[in-house]
Amino acid sequence: VRRKDGDAKVTGEAKYIDDLAFPNMIYGATVRSTIPHGRIRARHLTLTPDFIVADHRDIPGPNYVALIDPDQPCLAVDQVRHVAEPILLVGHADKHALIGLESRVSMEYDALPPNYDATASDVCFKKISIDKGDIDRGLADADIIVESEYRTGHQEQLYIETNGVIAVPGDGEMTVYGSLQCPYYVHKALVVLLNLPADRV
């Protein structure tokens, strides 16, 4: 099966996110947590009025990333749970105006005890049991039963560019262009966050 995007990628004709441009673009940056765990006490912004700032209250739909469980906010509300957790979105018509943003936007926290041991966390791991057929009977009839614990390293893909998206709003709809491995995950999350029907995203 020939990949639809194969020729464009191997010949260098494929467009990167930074190659795309639309009228009246606003460039965005994310203000992220600098501590692993804490309550947000205050935010300090020294930005001119031509900047746009959005927080969790500006999300039209429920504030969570729709993946498996609705347990991860898109933008932190009053507490951060890991370094680099998104808190604010900042936009400007000039992408160069976003450089050095960390010197003009800062968060004040009440630090809480972090957890550096993933195996001691009650939120990092999930046990999902897939049972098919009569398990007890199968075990009783088995000649050999192998029980063990396996650990594997973290796997990540090799992207041809850093992740990025461009969202183009329309009349009650949103079109998103992105460097995405799994666009259906992004689609599912955006439908919830934007509070739009699935066929409008």
Model-derived regions: residue spans:
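Structural alpha/beta core scaffold segments of enzyme domains
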Residues: 1-200
